[in-house]
Amino acid sequence: MSNLREECGVFGVFSGETNDVASTTYYGLFALQHRGQESCGIVVNDDGVFTDYKDTGLVNDVFTPNIIDRLGEGNIAIGHVRYGTTGSSERSNAQPIVVNHIKGKMALAHNGNLINSGELRRELELEGSIFHTTSDTEVISYIITKERLSAPSIEQAVNHAVDRIKGAYSLVIMSPSKLIAVRDENGFRPLCYGITKDGRYIVASESCALDAVGAEFIRDIKPGEIVVFDKNGVRSIEDHCGKAPGALCVFEYIYFARPDSVIDGCSVHSARLRAGAFLALEHPVQADVVIGVPDSGLDAALGYSKQSGIPYEIGFIKNKYIGRTFIAPGQKSREDKVKIKLNPIAEVVKGKRVVMIDDSIVRGTTSARIVKLLREAGAKEIHMRVCLLYTSDA
């Protein structure tokens, strides 16, 4: 893998009765906004009639009250927030994707990236498929619809398609009567589900989105598992479970996920605290203050402080209107955002030996700029500690 990528957030809701599933999906996507800020979309299913809207931009900007009203009520909905991994940031690559086929229709949203997308795309094009986007999500949707020609049900088509798609993926799929959740055999990307007090099933990339809509967490979806939600309840297809070792991306705990999420039974907040404590044990230093780089470095900084006994302070003020720097598309955009995203609190660092905790180094864009900011604010010494180092040629 030549560069590190964050791969979006997915959300789905299944209800036994028609209700405002669009608003529920909106709030779920809002809770997942940290996973991608390029584009977002929602598809609502009202008794087999699909209504969708998607565009570039943040959830709060794209889904105005008028747009939510236009989506209307339904009993199933899926949604997506995107950070591009394959395909450009154009509106055409926004998700979910809606596909009409000879046996009905389907909507699909995808978190991840395939390693055999190019091979599958060429195969499908030779068979006559016409692609309207450059994302591999459309490849997945065409593979499923192709399998649906001979499969007795949409879930069996998905089960057969899983044999063909290789890579990291968590999917939410909507048919006229079902919501389907799929996690790849390695469990590389997170996916979980829960239930609201009024009996609606919720699927999401992270448990924080369940909290946002008042759903009780039931469990994580297993690596390789397909979970089907319909009028008969919930059932699981585990034909692909246990075929590969678990391999959740470590960046989920270090950077991608919100600290209030629980992934595969482990609190993200606790994982970051432990990472900071480990840093203090492995790389101690004489210093006056510990600070963290907002937001994902804060928990680790607190862990470092507790383990080392060095006081923890808030060292930076973050401009909350600036998106996450690493997942901003384009190097120039990332550099510009760092300049206005963070400002050190001079009285905390001036004349002091500072331990600065960051979650990771990928491109080094943020780190170099932040060290310069601390020097300009008068820090006597700067001791940088990093939870995870990732070598990238990006």
Residue map of PLM features:
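Conserved short alpha-helical segments that host acidic/polar catalytic motifs at enzyme active sites
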Residues: 1-223, 228-287, 293, 381
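Short acidic loop-to-helix transition motifs that present clustered carboxylates
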Residues: 139, 297-298, 317-322
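Short, glycine/charge-rich flexible loops or terminal/linker lids adjacent to PRPP-binding catalytic cores
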Residues: 309-354, 365-368
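Conserved small/polar residues in nucleotide/adenosyl-binding loops
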Residues: 390-394
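Hydrophobic, well-ordered secondary-structure elements that form the walls
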Residues: 304, 360, 382
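Short beta-strand-centered segment that lines the nucleotide-binding/catalytic pocket of NTP-utilizing
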Residues: 386
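Secondary-structure transition/capping motifs at alpha-helix termini
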Residues: 129, 150-151, 284-288, 306-313, ...
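Extended, hydrophobic alpha-helical segments in both membrane/secreted and soluble proteins
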Residues: 290, 297-301, 312, 353-374
